């Protein structure tokens, strides 16, 4: 539940949404934050290329 919320929040709301979702869930918040940052990195890379 926490992972799904952090994942959806990060993808929809951006960096702040992903951080708030992962921290609010509290279940593996660090892992969720890393996954969100990795996804954002892929999105930025895809937009450039």
UniProtKB/Swiss-Prot annotation:
Residue stretches spanning the membrane: 29-49
GO biological process, alphabetically ordered: sporulation resulting in formation of a cellular spore
Top-level taxonomic group: Bacteria
Membrane topology: Single-pass membrane protein
Record-level GO cellular component terms: membrane
Subcellular location: Membrane
Keywords: Membrane, Sporulation, Transmembrane, Transmembrane helix
Main location as per UniProt: membrane
Entry's family note: Belongs to the SscA family.
Protein name: Sporulation protein YjcZ
Organism: Bacillus subtilis (strain 168)
Gene that encodes it: yjcZ
């Amino acid at each position: 539940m926490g992972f799904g919320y952090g994942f959806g929040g990060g993808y929809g709301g951006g960096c702040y949404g992903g951080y708030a979702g992962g921290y609010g869930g509290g279940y593996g918040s660090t892992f969720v934050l890393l996954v969100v940052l990795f996804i954002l990195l892929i999105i930025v890379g895809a937009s450039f290329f």
